[in-house]
Swiss-Prot record:
One of its GO terms (molecular function) is anaphase-promoting complex binding. It comes from Homo sapiens. This is Cyclin-F. Changing I772T: In FTDALS5; uncertain significance; impaired degradation by the ubiquitin proteasome system (UPS). Degraded when the spindle assembly checkpoint is activated during the G2-M transition. Degradation depends on the C-terminal PEST sequence. A motif (D box 5) lies at residues 767-770. Keywords: Amyotrophic lateral sclerosis, Cell cycle, Cell division, Cyclin, Cytoplasm, Cytoskeleton, Disease variant, Mitosis, Neurodegeneration, Nucleus, Phosphoprotein, Ubl conjugation, Ubl conjugation pathway.
Length: 786
């Protein structure tokens, strides 16, 4: 009863129970330490070694995980980190815990005496023993790839004094004699090294090592023994059949070279007792197992790289391969290594050329008898990079690719097809031409290498008017029908023959592949007329729904990403501004000289290359890296820019010591004659640098190489060597005005030789590049050098 005699009920409206107070529990603080130990391992794996050390210092629990678990160190990343006295303990600890990258880099660092300074006394012996230890460890950690460490210690060896390569070889051999396990791959590497000597005794030793390695289970050694015994087995049908069975066994176990040889052996199926259907199935399995790996992933990793930049790099590599007469397989493997590395690791634009030439050094050592030495590779880049830069890049590449150098290429499948099917020589050359053109275009990587090789053969046979371009036999061998190949054929034709190639600043297309196949060895096949798009559609029996595909790069501007070095300065200035130059420049050498220069130089260029090749020029094991290669190489001004003629600035060659009387205005007629000279077949200009309007910049192009008087350089003959060049790129700003300046002619190009005014001998004058630019412009420049 309430007040006033009012009765209240117990409803919720009249009566309220006191509410219960809910006590909020304080949430438990969860940190990274609360995660299970297995999850922490996955987080710590693949971190860089610097990050692992930083995490280790955070908490005692993390410190225990890092210190007591080998898997953390085995998976640690040493990307862009090189052994030095300060971090040597980290590298050694990681290598001993099973880190492949650390072991490879330590072996290379000791072999080339790079980063780890060792006293000159007994340096080869000390470094050789240490390099042997880590190379052996790297080979034991090598999983799924053929033995590879032999490519670092292969001949030529030094003939004077102690040789670090020889010390490594002997140390590895002694290790194999002491240890019973994990020595099959080491024995194979020792055999590969000895097999490259011409001495019969060493050849026999190599054969014995291969036999021992094969007995220990090395599949690659077993295949090499089969290859050496193949010639003798052919004479006896019984032995031939036994040899074929062994080859089939090696192929089934995964040896790529054995798989290729097995497919080629099916050409003699009757002698082997195989039915046509069985032999076709063997080849078909090889072709159908080929998988496409899109190279467009490169551009998702390399944000500053585009298809045109890659085109220029590959075009330059083709020129190097042509100059050094490397095989198509070597070229294709080099490009594959470049693309695989670009998909895995970020590469600044100014290091693209370094990556390309380092991949070529590795691939020539792995598959060729004639190699590209480190010193010669540095020379080919016009000394843009140093000896140690290339050595370190080799370590980065091998570790990033996990020692796997040999991969299937378009050339492999093409060779199988040309072995199994009778094809005219002209058609073979055209097929090879198409396969190398495919290297330049990443969009063609959407097709598997086997399909691309089949499409190249079909297009070649169509071009040469074959009545049955794709027979039933080819269908059975490859598993690709005529209709399956039509899209690939159309894409291949469009990219190779319709789309315009990037052009340099003189609107000269970059056509290194075409020039390569203008040689008589290939029947000058690149000069033949090809089918038009409409003719190809008619030959394929498909309707042409649209007009001929439009070309790209025909108009508009493509910003330059490569640049020549800014002038030849003194050695001290070059060393002081090394990082500045590396961030802005790249050059390339010219491959050929004019007839006048060849007459003057005689065999000097050959002598220069001889001095830069082989072990005596390389001095790799001795660590003699000081000094620059004296022979200057020309610079490829491969500029990918469409120039408006009104904005084109006059460009002429210049020397470091220009003559004062040449400072006046240049004769317009002489300039016109100079700019009309056709490009030489050597490497083309790769890069341009931006400059401010009105600034005087002197440059040299191919005209300076092809028309310079051989006797007008300096007394001697060195001045007529291939000359570096530089080029200019237009500013992207819409308000950029045409540049007007007084260009002066090169003393080497225009002036006859004059006697010295005094008895003091004149200093050697070298062709230079002068590119005046601002710091802001440097940030927008990328490079590639040949």
């Amino acid at each position: 009863m309430g007040s006033g005699g009012v009765v209240h009920c117990r409803c919720a409206k009249c009566f309220c129970y006191p509410t219960k107070r809910r006590i909020r529990r304080r949430p438990r603080n969860l940190t990274i330490l609360s995660l299970p130990e297995d999850v922490l391992f996955h987080i710590l794996k693949w971190l860089s070694v610097e990050d692992i050390l930083a995490v280790r210092a955070v908490h005692s629990q993390l410190k225990d995980l890092v210190d007591n678990h080998a898997s953390v160190w085995a998976c640690a990343s040493f990307q862009e980190l090189w052994p030095s006295p300060g971090n040597l303990k980290l590298f050694e600890r990681a290598a001993e815990k099973g880190n492949f990258e650390a072991a490879v880099k330590l072996g290379i660092a000791y072999l080339y005496n790079e980063g780890l300074s060792v006293s000159d006394e007994a340096r080869a012996e000390v470094n050789g023993l240490k390099a042997s230890r880590f190379f052996s460890l790297a080979e034991r950690l090598n999983v799924g790839a053929a033995p590879f460490i032999w490519l670092f210690i292969r001949p030529p060896w030094s003939v004077s004094g102690s040789c670090c390569k020889a010390v490594v070889h002997e140390s590895l051999r002694a290790e194999c004699q002491l240890q019973r396990t994990h020595k099959a791959s080491i024995l194979h590497c020792l055999g590969r090294v000895l097999s490259l000597f011409e001495d019969e005794e060493k050849q026999q030793q190599a054969h014995d090592l291969f036999e021992e390695a094969a007995h220990q289970g090395c599949l690659t050694s077993s295949y090499l023994l089969w290859e050496s015994d193949r010639r003798t087995d052919v004479s006896d049908p019984g032995r031939c059949l036994h040899s074929f069975r062994k080859l089939r066994d090696y192929a089934a176990k995964g040896c790529w070279e054995a798989q290729l040889s097995l497919a080629k052996a099916c050409a003699n199926a009757n002698q082997l007792g195989l039915e046509v259907r069985a032999s076709s199935e063997i080849v078909c399995q090889l072709f159908q197992a080929s998988q496409a790996v899109s190279k467009q992933q490169v551009f998702s990793v390399q944000k500053g790289l585009n298809d045109t930049m890659r085109y220029i790099l590959i075009d330059w590599l083709v020129e190097v391969a042509t100059m050094k007469d490397f095989t198509s397989l070597c070229l294709h493997l080099t490009v594959e290594c470049v693309d695989r590395y670009l998909r895995r690791r970020l590469v600044p634009r100014y290091r693209l050329q370094l990556l390309g030439i380092a991949c070529m050094v590795i691939c020539t050592r792995f598959i060729s008898k004639e190699i590209l030495t480190i010193r010669e590779a540095v020379w080919l880049t016009d000394n843009t990079y140093k000896y140690e830069d290339l050595v370190r890049m080799m370590g980065e590449i091998v570790s990033a690719l996990e020692g796997k150098i040999r991969v299937p290429t378009v050339v492999d499948y093409k060779e199988v097809l040309l072995t199994l099917v009778p094809v005219e020589l002209r058609t073979q050359h055209l097929c090879s031409f198409l396969c190398e053109l495919s290297l330049l275009h990443t969009s063609l990587s959407a097709y598997a290498p086997a399909r691309l090789a089949a499409a190249a053969l079909l297009l070649a046979r169509l071009t040469h008017g074959q009545t049955q371009p794709w027979t039933t036999q080819l269908w059975d061998l490859t598993g690709f029908s005529y209709e399956d190949l039509i899209p690939c054929v159309l894409s291949l034709h469009k990219k190779c023959f319709h789309d315009d190639a990037p052009k340099d600043y003189r609107q000269v297309s970059l056509t290194a592949v075409k020039q390569r196949f203008e040689d008589k060895r290939y029947g000058e096949i690149s000069q033949e007329e090809v089918l038009s798009y409409s003719q190809l559609c008619a030959a394929l029996g498909v309707t042409q729904d649209s007009p001929d595909p439009p070309t790209f790069l025909s108009t508009g501007e493509i910003h330059a990403f490569l640049s020549s070095p800014s002038g030849r300065r003194t050695k001290r200035k070059r060393e002081n501004s090394l990082q500045e130059d590396r961030g802005s420049f790249v050059t390339t050498p010219t491959a050929e000289l004019s007839s006048q220069e060849e007459t003057l130089l005689g065999s000097f260029l050959d002598w220069s290359l001889d001095c830069c090749s082989g072990y005596e020029g390389d001095q790799e094991s001795e660590g003699e890296k000081e000094g620059d290669v004296t022979a200057p190489s020309g610079i490829l001004d491969v500029t990918v820019v469409y120039l408006n003629p009104e904005q084109h600035c006059c460009q002429e060659s210049s020397d470091e010591e220009a003559c004062p009387e040449d400072k006046g205005p240049q004769d317009p007629q002489a300039l016109a004659l100079d700019t009309q000279i056709p490009a030489t077949p050597g490497p083309k200009p790769l890069v341009r640098t931006s400059r401010e309007p009105g600034k005087d910049v002197t440059t040299s192009g191919y005209s300076s190489v092809s028309t310079a008087s051989p006797t007008s350089s300096v007394d001697g003959g060195l001045g007529a060597l291939p000359q570096p060049t530089s080029v200019l790129s237009l500013d992207s700003d819409s308000h950029t005005q045409p540049c007007h300046h007084q260009a002066r002619k090169s003393c080497l190009q225009c002036r006859p030789p004059s006697p010295p005014e005094s008895s003091v001998p004149q200093q050697q004058v070298k062709r230079i590049n002068l590119c005046i630019h601002s710091e802001e412009e440097d940030m927008n420049l990328g490079l590639v050098r040949l």
